[in-house]
Amino acid sequence: MDQRILNVELRSKTGKGISRQLRRSESIPGVVYGKGIESVSVSLKTKELSNAIAGEGGRNHILTLKGGGSLDGQMVIVADLLQDSLKGLPLHVDLHKINLADKIKVKVKVNLVGTAAGVKEGGLLDFAMHEIEIECLPSHIPEHLDVDVTSLTLGHSIHIGDLKELPGIKVLGDPKASIISVLGRAKEEAAPVAEA
């Protein structure tokens, strides 16, 4: 996972009024917290945040903070992002300070590879789990987890426990939880036509 720069400014005032003022000036409020530091209120440009988390990996990019006094040079990931439900614009962000030597838990997207054999037989793909929680060092966070579905037949599923192990990455969650299934019945062969 690549590292990106994010400019932040310390802010001493908090509350709805200040948050609205920030949003009008194309900035958003945020907070930085983590092991070894007290929570610090910050503001940052909306466009910079959007660019920093754009593309594969999204919120799991390691961000290096610039500005913000004692926060300068700290590495963070986006722990939570509150967005406007209609416009999709960021409203508030929680940034979690990380240490590259400590494992963290993050959710990564599931990327389906291939076409399931059961779909070719007329089945319907049920993609139940679009993200999977993993634990690893920040430098080992994958952009996504590939799940090969080519051999998935009708009435069968791929579960968390079926995923192959990746070096340095521990997949979390119930091993019996279904990630993807193929629903439906096999096509019935046409019944022979009786001669009159």
UniProtKB/Swiss-Prot annotation:
<dbReference type="GO" id="GO:0006412">
    <property type="term" value="P:translation"/>
</dbReference>
<dbReference type="InterPro" id="IPR001021">
    <property type="entry name" value="Ribosomal_bL25_long"/>
</dbReference>
<dbReference type="InterPro" id="IPR020930">
    <property type="entry name" value="Ribosomal_uL5_bac-type"/>
</dbReference>
<dbReference type="GO" id="GO:0022625">
    <property type="term" value="C:cytosolic large ribosomal subunit"/>
</dbReference>
<comment type="function">
    <text>This is one of the proteins that binds to the 5S RNA in the ribosome where it forms part of the central protuberance.</text>
</comment>
<protein>
    <recommendedName>
        <fullName>Large ribosomal subunit protein bL25</fullName>
    </recommendedName>
</protein>
<dbReference type="Pfam" id="PF01386">
    <property type="entry name" value="Ribosomal_L25p"/>
</dbReference>
<dbReference type="InterPro" id="IPR037121">
    <property type="entry name" value="Ribosomal_bL25_C"/>
</dbReference>
<comment type="similarity">
    <text>Belongs to the bacterial ribosomal protein bL25 family. CTC subfamily.</text>
</comment>
<dbReference type="InterPro" id="IPR020057">
    <property type="entry name" value="Ribosomal_bL25_b-dom"/>
</dbReference>
<keyword id="KW-0689">Ribosomal protein</keyword>
<keyword id="KW-0694">RNA-binding</keyword>
<dbReference type="InterPro" id="IPR011035">
    <property type="entry name" value="Ribosomal_bL25/Gln-tRNA_synth"/>
</dbReference>
<dbReference type="Pfam" id="PF14693">
    <property type="entry name" value="Ribosomal_TL5_C"/>
</dbReference>
<comment type="subunit">
    <text>Part of the 50S ribosomal subunit; part of the 5S rRNA/L5/L18/L25 subcomplex. Contacts the 5S rRNA. Binds to the 5S rRNA independently of L5 and L18.</text>
</comment>
<keyword id="KW-0687">Ribonucleoprotein</keyword>
<dbReference type="InterPro" id="IPR029751">
    <property type="entry name" value="Ribosomal_L25_dom"/>
</dbReference>
<dbReference type="GO" id="GO:0003735">
    <property type="term" value="F:structural constituent of ribosome"/>
</dbReference>
<keyword id="KW-0699">rRNA-binding</keyword>
<dbReference type="GO" id="GO:0008097">
    <property type="term" value="F:5S rRNA binding"/>
</dbReference>
<dbReference type="InterPro" id="IPR020056">
    <property type="entry name" value="Rbsml_bL25/Gln-tRNA_synth_N"/>
</dbReference>
